[in-house]
Every structure is written in structure tokens, then in C-alpha cells.
Amino acid sequence: MIILDQTIVNVALPSIQSDLGFSQSSLAWVINAYLIAFGGLLLLAGRLGDLIGRKRIFLTGLTLFTAASLLCGISQSQEMLIGARFVQGLGGSMTAAVILGMIVTMFTEPADQAKAIAVYSFVAASGGAIGLLAGGALTEAINWHWIFFVNIPIGVATGVAAIKLLKHEEGIGFEQSADVPGALLSVSSLMLLVYTIVETSTYGWGSLHTIGFGALAIALMVGFFVREATAKHPLMPLRIFESRNVTVANGVQALMVAGIFGMFFLGALYLQQVLGYDAVDVGLAFLPIALAIAALSLGVSARLITRFGAKNTLIPGLLVLPIGLAYFARAPIDANYLTDLFPAFLLLGIGAGLSFPSLMTLAMAGATQEDSGLASGLVNTTQQVGGALGLAVLATIATSRTDTLTAAGSSDAAALLGGFHVAWAIAAGLSAVAFLLAVTLLKPDHVAAAEVAQREEEVRVSRGLGSDPRQAEQPEFAYATDE
């Protein structure tokens, strides 16, 4: 529901603009209000799940998201819709931030955990394609209000199931005090960073607005890390970055989603503005990506991760992704779907279907149990910031190249396609860099698992809990070795 909402709205924007009288610049805030709230609260929400209980945070976020969806659906003014979208982003971030943390604490057996993460990864990775199709179908069949109303029964059903099925947990508590300065610095820096990125389409990268707000966001982020390094009870213990796999997996994900998000956004524009597809056709065109992700995430990746390890499953996926993007970067002005587009979409689906479950497994397996909510929030934050930054950069590059070609006398379609080609080629390059980082920097699964077991033991001893005899038997995140 939350993943779909990030793309389902895109297809309905023309109808929303017509009904509510948005200008082209103000229309962007239907998307930006959600992104700023969603990206800004993820890290804090993930950590709050560790501290006061993930089920509590999940249900609070789900309630906010569902209620805000109702407000979005009944909106009759620009201000009401933008405000409701901001609240929807807050609720979505609270729910999304703790999901992976709940998975790794509920499913402690490696095989079960791999299956659960694979299901989550399918939803996260294929949501973009499914959202485009659902948005087009609902907007054309009924009206744009229903892209929000559809969330309400899903949200209610999910809430009832969560209350009945999820185990209650108190969390580890705030110890002696809450890190209020850390929380304020975290939320303000991330919200400001996402705001700066999404507004580059209006102000440009070299403008005083972008440079000023970007510098302020970075300064606040530096202040946040300084605070966490010196606080007695930090909101985000920096020990999480002691795990190389946590750090590298998040970096690899940022590069990967930067390319994929750019491909979805610019690819949809290419299909509509160059090839003349309507909204439903765009969704159907991207459907092979979702189907390939489903086939691999739900049927194959979990078994591969359990058998060969997450790193060894990730590498082939990251190898296929840049090949798919490079193939897409040669799409002609009169493309035939079966020969020019379908192979690229199939390769992208295969690459994402192998990569997302593996990356999430690596990022979560590198964190201790008590930091699992924080690790979950970090994974989602990396995905949002990486995707927003990648989309902004690739869209700017595409626009610049299009303007150059238009000035040189190219037709509108040829100029647009020239811009898309450059952006997709850069997206392929980003994915190739992600592949190289994964190959050279990620540690084998069994090495990372042993390090986590050692850190958990050190935490137990430091708190006077004594040694955990289970550590002598097997670390919790024990996958097949990849030597």
C-alpha cells in the first residue's frame, strides 16, 4: 500500500491538476509533500521502534496513513490535498521504517527470514511498476480520488491483522533520557535534504536556493552525527556503522535505486511523450519488471540466499542490472516493444529480483537485534534519499541534453529521446559502480554473522547480563559460507 502510493499518484497528476487548478510548479508539491515527510522521519521512526516497540510504531503509522488517505480522497482544494499528503508521508514512514526490523525479530531461522525478506523485497521493488498500472486504471475507470480511497480498506484490513497477529513488545526503552536534540537534528536535516533535492527541478543545481539549503542540510546532518558521537544515550548509536556490510549494502542500494528510479520516471515519459502510450499502456509496458521480480523474489531468491549466501546471490543481480539499463539506453524513436523494450525490462526485473532481497538481508544481518529497527529505518532512508537524488540528477541531465538538441534543430521527439538516452546511460553506470562496490567491499555472510554475534555478546556483558550460551552454538544470522 505504501510502496504503491509513491508511484500510483504520478499517473493521476494531470487529472488532479485539472480538477483542483494546480499550476505546473505547485503540482509538484502533491509529490514533494509526501516525499519530504516520508524521507525525513524514517530514521527516527525506525529507532523509536527499537525503543518503544515496533508494533506500536507500525500501528500508529498505519492509522495516520489510512486516515490521511481518506482526507486526500475527499480533498477539494490544493491546500487540503498537500497537507493530507504530508500527513500521509509521516504515517507511511512510521510504518515502512519498522517492517524489516519486525521481520528479522519475528523470523529468526535463516531460511524463514530469507523468505520473509524476499516477500518484502518483491513488494518494495515491484511497487513502482504496479503503481503505474493501478494509477492509470483507477484514474481512467473512475477518477483520481480513488487512487487514495483504495488505501482505506487495505489499511483497515492490515490493521486488524496486525493487532491479532503481531506480538506485543515494549522495546528496549529510553534508558535514562530521550535524545531530543538528536531527534530534531535527524528529522530537520533529512527533511531539508529531501526538500533541496526535489526543488532542484524548479531552482536548478547552481542556484543560491539549492546551494544555501543544501549547505544547511549538510550542516545539520554533521551536527546530528557529532551529537550521536557524544550523547550518553544517542538516538542512533554509531556502532551500527561498525559493520562494513551495513554501510556498504546501504551505499550499494543508494546507487542502485538512483538508476532504477530514474529509469521508471524517465521511461514513463518516453513511453508517453515519444511513443504515444496512454496511462494504462505505460503500466502494462512495465508489467514484465514486476512479474520477473515476483518470480525471483518469491520463488528463487530466498532459496539462493539460504544455499549460497546473500552476497553470492547479490552479485549476479547487480551484474544484470546495468546490462538491462544499457540496453534500454539504445531504445529508438519508433521502438518495437518486443524487441527494443521487453528484453530490457526483463533484465531489469531479473536484476532487481535478485538484488533487493540480498541487499536487505545483508543490511539487516549486519545489525544486532536491538538495532534492527534502526537498521530498517536506515535501509529505507537510503532508498528514499538515493532515489530522490538519482531522479533529480538524471532528470536535470536529460532536460539539459534535450534543450541542447532542440536548440540545434532536432524535433521534439528526437530531442526528448536524446536526453533520455544520456540519463539512462548514466543510470547504467551507477549500477555498474554498485556492482564493483559489492564485489570488492562486502564481506562473506559467515564473517559478518560472526561479527554480529560478537557485538551482541559484548553488549550483553556490558549490561551485566552475562554470556549468552547460545552464541557458542550458532550466530543468529548464519547463512551459507561464500568462500
What does each of the following model-derived ranges do?
Residues 1-164, 299, 308, 314, ...:
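Transmembrane-helix bundle of Major Facilitator Superfamily
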Residues 53-62, 76-80, 95-99, 105-118, ...:
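C-terminal module of multi-pass small-molecule transporters
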Residues 16-17, 48-49, 134-142, 197, ...:
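Interfacial helix-cap and linker-helix signal at transmembrane-aqueous boundaries
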Residues 152-171, 187-199, 216-231, 434-444:
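C-terminal membrane-cytosol helix-exit motif in multi-pass small-molecule transporters
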Residues 3-37, 181, 206-213, 219-223, ...:
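Transmembrane core module of solute transporters
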Residues 36, 70-71, 86, 147, ...:
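Hydrophobic residues within the alpha-helical transmembrane core of Major Facilitator Superfamily
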Residues 2, 31-34, 38, 65, ...:
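Structural signature of transmembrane alpha-helices in multi-pass secondary transporters
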Residues 172, 441-483:
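Intrinsic disorder in cytosolic terminal tails and internal cytosolic loops
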